[in-house]
UniProtKB/Swiss-Prot annotation:
Keywords: Cytoplasm, Isomerase, Porphyrin biosynthesis, Pyridoxal phosphate
Catalytic EC class: isomerase
Annotated GO MF terms: glutamate-1-semialdehyde 2,1-aminomutase activity; pyridoxal phosphate binding; transaminase activity
Organism domain of life: Bacteria
Record-stated family: Belongs to the class-III pyridoxal-phosphate-dependent aminotransferase family. HemL subfamily.
Record note on quaternary structure: Homodimer.
Stored CDD domains: OAT_like
Record-listed E.C. numbers: 5.4.3.8
GO terms for cellular component: cytoplasm
Swiss-Prot/TrEMBL cofactor(s): pyridoxal 5'-phosphate
Gene: hemL
Pfam families: Aminotran_3 (PF00202)
Protein's name according to its UniProt entry: Glutamate-1-semialdehyde 2,1-aminomutase
GO biological process: protoporphyrinogen IX biosynthetic process
Amino acid sequence: MSRSETLFANAQKHIPGGVNSPVRAFKSVGGTPLFFKHAAGAYVTDEDDKRYVDYVGSWGPMILGHSHPDVLDAVRSQLEHGLSYGAPTAMETEMADLVCELVPSMEMVRMVSSGTEATMSAIRLARGFTGRDSILKFEGCYHGHSDSLLVKAGSGALTLGVPSSPGVPAAFAKHTLTVPFNNLDAVRDLLAEVGQEVACIIVEPVAGNMNCVPPAPGYLQGLRELCDEHGVVLIFDEVMTGFRVALGGAQAYYGVTPDLSTFGKIIGGGMPVGCFGGKREIMSHIAPLGPVYQAGTLSGNPLAMAAGLTTLRLISRPGFHDELSDYTRRLLEGLQQRADAAGIPFVTTQAGGMFGLYFSEADEIVTFEDVMTSDSERFKRFFHLMLDGGVYLAPSAFEAGFTSIAHGDAELKLTLDAAEKAFAALK
């Protein structure tokens, strides 16, 4: 038995499914999940000392690559001063100032400890601000695991093959309205019928939890206009896209301004962090300024602020995101060329430093239906063939891939060499 197999067997005794987040269990791709013990740069190393080029990046945060020395130094320095105070710190204000500088729509910001907390809090705030109960989300979009958002969700919910989670009361779900992603007419029709009841529309600007589906041309701007027409708060869930597709997030990349935004992953530099924010008019309703309650024991904790501030400053250098996008483009072009040469139907998508891989006959991937008709069985085989070749992809056909600035020519060659062999084996 490999050490990962032994560790997984032991883990299942006291951890449900042997993992602390479902997609890690490899249920979607089969086999034993890898247990990692080290990560540096573009690589992760498992418990059996095999090293892999990593395109998961801890599900998005590691945009600098793993174990960046400046981030580690910042955390070590803060360790000397304590782990958590449960009181305000200067770094929290520095973080808020920097986020508001980098993302112009953010006039005020509240730190939390996860992306789920951020989206949950933003929706509560939108409801409190508008006095309305219903929310509108999109099929296949995932906004964390709070009850009202696990309706027709993506990410792990798709991996499990269930559109919604048991344990979500019907009374909660009835206030969550869903329409297809990238279908502006469906939004228009629904708001024409019940717009006066809808507090907010929450959307991933790039749907990164049904792999990676960019918005159709004009889609985000159309949502902006419909929200303005019906007095609905527009929330961009940028937990995944924030600071990755562009320094100012997807809202800068696509030129559409939301009312509220949520962030996570990169903003913590690998530590557990999230935040939500937006218009001062709306944020002034959050406690202690207003009546909408939100709190957190570890919100704005100094270790996370140290890691996050350092990360955001490093990725702010001119040219950073151009380099990240260029590597991702070269990766996808190389994969497409090798799939075509092998006669394998294959489609890729990209938004900055995130990407999607689909075994599909479709000309392009635009809708949830396009995603669901891709060949997940072929992806399973491809995943394990790439793993054998030293490349770690997300262990699900429904999860986006991520590149980092640590990925370079050597990693690209290794990845494409492994892919060429994998595509040949898939014939």
